[in-house]
Design a protein with these regions (language model features):
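Post-transcriptional modification and biogenesis factors for structured RNAs
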Residues: 1-143
C-alpha cells in the first residue's frame, strides 16, 4: 500500500518471481513505476512475477472485501511466528516511512507484527515482505 521506494518494489517483484507468490501493489506510488531503480532491483524477473496494480485502496478493498485480509505493522497485536498465515488471502504492508494509516487499521482486520528489538523503529519494507513470505511458505512446506 502506497509504496515510496522504487528499490523496495523491485526487490518484492524479484521475491514474487522466486517464490511464486503474487504481489499486489496499491497506488499512489512515490515514484514512477517505470523507474530504473525498480528494474535494477528486480533484475530480469519482471516477466516471471505475478504483479497486480490497484489504482487506490478503495479499488483494492471493493474487489477484495470478502477475502481474508491481515495487516502487518509494528502496532500488531500478534507476531507472525504465532499466527497461522494460511488463514489470509492478502497481507497488507504500509508505506515505508509511516506504516499503515489509522483509518485503514480501523477496519478491524488482524494486525500482525514481525518480532524485533524493542528499541528498533521498523524493518526495511522489502526485508519485511521477505520475512513474512518465507514464514508463509515455511508454514505450507510439505517435504
Amino acid at each position: 500500500y502506497k509504496r515510496e521506494i522504487a528499490g523496495n518494489v523491485g526487490a518484492c517483484i524479484r521475491l514474487s518471481a522466486n517464490t511464486g507468490l503474487a504481489l499486489n501493489l496499491i497506488k499512489p506510488f512515490g515514484f514512477s513505476f517505470q523507474e530504473n531503480k525498480i528494474r535494477r532491483a528486480g533484475l530480469d524477473y519482471h516477466d516471471l512475477a505475478s504483479v497486480s496494480v490497484f489504482e487506490n485502496w478503495n479499488n483494492f478493498y471493493s474487489e477484495n472485501k470478502d477475502k481474508k485480509i491481515c495487516f502487518l505493522s509494528v502496532k500488531g497485536s500478534q507476531n507472525i511466528w504465532d499466527a497461522n498465515l494460511n488463514e489470509y488471502d492478502y497481507m497488507i504492508f504500509g508505506p515505508e516511512s509511516v506504516g499503515l494509516p489509522d483509518d485503514i487499521l480501523a477496519l478491524q482486520y488482524e494486525t500482525l507484527s514481525i518480532p524485533m528489538n524493542d528499541n528498533s523503529r521498523s524493518i526495511n519494507l522489502a526485508n519485511a515482505v521477505s520475512i513474512v513470505s518465507y514464514e508463509f511458505l515455511r508454514q505450507n512446506y510439505k517435504n
